[in-house]
From Swiss-Prot:
GO molecular function terms attached to this record: NADH dehydrogenase (ubiquinone) activity; NADH:ubiquinone reductase (non-electrogenic) activity; quinone binding
Described function: NDH-1 shuttles electrons from NADH, via FMN and iron-sulfur (Fe-S) centers, to quinones in the respiratory chain. The immediate electron acceptor for the enzyme in this species is believed to be ubiquinone. Couples the redox reaction to proton translocation (for every two electrons transferred, four hydrogen ions are translocated across the cytoplasmic membrane), and thus conserves the redox energy in a proton gradient.
Localization per record: Cell inner membrane
Source lineage: Bacteria, Pseudomonadati, Pseudomonadota, Gammaproteobacteria, Legionellales
Stated name of the protein: NADH-quinone oxidoreductase subunit C
Entries under InterPro entries matching the protein: NADH_DH_suC, NADH_quin_OxRdtase_su_C/D-like, NADH_UbQ_OxRdtase_30kDa_su, NADH_UbQ_OxRdtase_CS
Keywords: Cell inner membrane, Cell membrane, Membrane, NAD, Quinone, Translocase, Transport, Ubiquinone
Family assignment from sequence similarity: Belongs to the complex I 30 kDa subunit family.
Organism the protein comes from: Legionella pneumophila subsp. pneumophila (strain Philadelphia 1 / ATCC 33152 / DSM 7513)
Subunit structure and binding partners: NDH-1 is composed of 14 different subunits. Subunits NuoB, C, D, E, F, and G constitute the peripheral sector of the complex.
Membrane disposition: Peripheral membrane protein
EC number(s) stated in the UniProt entry for this protein: 7.1.1.-
The protein's enzyme class: translocase
GO CC field: plasma membrane
Length: 227
């Protein structure tokens, strides 16, 4: 039995009532849970001997607003630069019948030497998730970053302030509906002799079409999905 098979067996036995989905692909195990079950699940994952996830190595937000929309599709290899699109696409490549936003946690057990991805989807109308700062101190800046870039609130965080954007920044720049050129630009006004903020005068346009292609590293090696 591999480490992942052992982990999956224990997850199904101990957390079946708290997780909504469990998948294994490309040597990585992922579970999904509801927002209200996040803290019970995380406590079990940290404290149970068979899991022993003592480190939170990453936490991020995801916006699925335009997920599956694409301009071109190609089977060309991904390791040798971009290629021309071969066929104009009109329909979605993938459909996600879940809320727009998700929070993803990556856990590591230094004792058991295994990893786990935990994902939960959050309703756009109620972007509030319990903080896990009291379980892993590394969550502090991770949660601040997710708040800054996506607008996801973490209930119970000790200091939920923006981390990367400027003072007075409006909006959340990693959201898919945030314009690539931004909302405002900063420049020095020689007449006023000071730095001012003004609306951007760049016209938004697509210079590189959105491409969805299979990763050639896994083509012909589908058996590795369940390792």
């Amino acid at each position: 039995m591999t480490k992942n098979e052992y982990l999956i067996e224990k997850l199904q036995a101990d957390l079946a009532n708290h997780i909504t989905e469990l998948t294994s692909a490309y040597g990585e195990v992922t579970i999904e849970c509801e927002v209200q079950n996040l803290l019970p699940v995380m406590i079990e994952l940290r404290d149970r001997e068979e899991f022993s996830f003592d480190q939170l190595i990453d936490l991020c937000g995801v916006d699925y607003l335009h997920y599956g929309d694409y301009d071109w599709e190609t089977e060309s290899a991904t390791e040798h630069g971009f290629s021309r699109g071969v066929e104009r696409q009109e329909a979605k490549a993938y459909a996600v019948n879940k809320p727009r936003f998700a929070v993803v946690y990556h856990l590591l057990s230094t004792k058991k030497n295994h990893r786990l991805r935990v994902k939960l989807f959050v309703e756009e109308s109620h972007l509030i998730v319990p903080s896990v700062h009291h379980l892993w101190k590394s969550a502090n800046w991770f949660e601040r970053e997710a708040y800054d870039l996506y607008g996801i609130l973490f209930d119970g965080h000790p200091d939920l302030r923006r981390l990367l954007t400027d003072y007075g920044f409006i909006g959340h720049p990693f959201r898919k509906d945030f314009p690539l050129s931004g909302e405002v630009e900063m420049r020095y006004d020689a007449k006023l002799q000071k730095v001012i903020y003004a609306p951007v005068d760049i016209v938004p346009r697509i210079v590189v079409p959105k491409v969805i292609r299979n990763d050639n590293r896994y083509i012909g090696n589908e058996g590795s999905k369940n390792d």
